């Protein structure tokens, strides 16, 4: 980081809080386009084209101020989308530069917050699976959950105000506001789901930064409100998985927002409330009464409406009883069920049968939504019958087989924590036959004739690969391997949800 600061002359900019001059540094756009840090430092083999030159950036900013370049009417917005894929406008260049520069104050503040503190800096994202042991430990002892979808988007000026509290360069904020306001249909852009998808795909770094800024502001206020209740302090467990350079875990919000609030939230004292979030969906779990959960519901609605000026109806927040409803989260269906057991106890000549029914979190694969995702990706039809998938003609048989195996492996790893793994056999069966039909279609044959020609061992890896993977980790007896394969296995290297598993 010290070498990075020296290269970008960040110390000088940090002293004066100047970000605007960085817009006219060409290496900023090299940073935006290149993903290898060594190439930034050496300025060798820079991976951006001549369209990202400093001259073009200066012309773009000049034309922005002249009001004759970015004004787009509603009629030709489809042809001339400012935030779309039209490379002739070069709008993506500026948005990427904005994203790189505006992250600098956050990164520097993060590093300074670690100075003098005994906190281990980790730049690797925690695995998604790490949250499930936490849920297994806590949810069986709780009564109610609340599914909360964080409303977005918010008004453009609210985003600017959020950034203003952390970015002190008025010139930079003015240009950022001007840059966003130049799009005449901005309000339409940020309201429709389709437009949000287009914006996030064409400008992912910029979109994620704006979204994360909104989420950080919301969660800092929300956790602060939770701490203000005398007996309602929050136990928080979660990670900002979708962020790019906001490395801080949610457990350390106390340090990040210490300057914003006079009272530092305490997260690890009271077991009444638990908060978990991934992307725009969060869960509040509590052991208390529905009355308390209703209070929290209206706290959230008032927070969104009064502070962020986002309309949100209380009916969007659902309060469910854990014993009667399943929890749809992170591609799994989770429910709390009784696990009855009988224990025989003998004292002297008398024996007793003790009925015990502890609660257990049952985590299963949502087979119907998962088949729907496979059908949407053209691996099967709506009824789950495998079909051949269109592939490029120049792909070899090995490449086609390897692609199917990679998809099967990713799904198997992600759903390795399911308590009922037999349902995964159906998914593997669909992928296996889809692979066979795809290869048979390439060779202009039938699936039966193709299997007869190559042998059934050709696709056996779909069913044996998971056990072989476990055998590398646990080199023990076959009985132990079978027990491990039937049990739950949580992997610590899964940092995002597979696209097929994310069926929401």
Swiss-Prot record:
Changing residue 340 to T: In haplotype A. The keyword Cell cycle does not apply. This is Maturase K. Its main location: plastid. GO terms for cellular component: chloroplast. GO terms for molecular function: RNA binding. The gene is matK. It is found in: Plastid, Chloroplast. Changing residue 477 to S: In haplotypes K and L. It comes from the Eukaryota. InterPro entries: Domain_X (IPR024937), Maturase_MatK (IPR002866), Maturase_MatK_N (IPR024942). Keywords: Chloroplast, mRNA processing, Plastid, RNA-binding, tRNA processing. PANTHER family: MATURASE K (PTHR34811:SF1). It comes from Fagus crenata (Japanese beech). HAMAP family: MatK (MF_01390). The keyword Chloroplast applies. Usually encoded in the trnK tRNA gene intron. Probably assists in splicing its own and other chloroplast group II introns. One of its GO terms (biological process) is mRNA processing. Disulfide bonds: none annotated. Belongs to the intron maturase 2 family. MatK subfamily.
